[in-house]
Amino acid sequence: MTHDNKLQVEAIKRGTVIDHIPAQIGFKLLSLFKLTETDQRITIGLNLPSGEMGRKDLIKIENTFLSEDQVDQLALYAPQATVNRIDNYEVVGKSRPSLPERIDNVLVCPNSNCISHAEPVSSSFAVRKRANDIALKCKYCEKEFSHNVVLAN
């Protein structure tokens, strides 16, 4: 008996592949990073089998490349992610996110009294690594939160 090894998610000719996203996080990344605000084809694989992770999510975006800042902002959600740059169906670049000093225009402050909810300002958080956590400090209300609190918001 032979087993055919098939791609579970179709290959792309040119663009970005975000691999090794923890299961159940793929849709959150699409929404937070506004990755769907494009006319390019996006392919999503959810709960795919992974030798390393058990299950994983995967996002492929054709003709779109993430900036270094965008890649680093993934570190909060998918620290083990791999971001592959594809050209002519080949991986031409590979990077992993590293925790940035700031995250702008992505998150929402969990403090309901924060001015960022009432004024037309872009969100901005300073990122600080702690022993077993990552702290995010809002630029406007100056309150500090565990990254899990901000991500759940």
From Swiss-Prot:
Any GO molecular function: zinc ion binding
Keyword tRNA processing recorded: no
This protein's GO CC annotations: aspartate carbamoyltransferase complex; cytoplasm
Pfam short name (any one): PyrI_C
Cofactor(s) in the UniProt record: Zn(2+)
Chain's role: Involved in allosteric regulation of aspartate carbamoyltransferase.
Protein name as catalogued: Aspartate carbamoyltransferase regulatory chain
Organism per entry: Escherichia coli (strain K12)
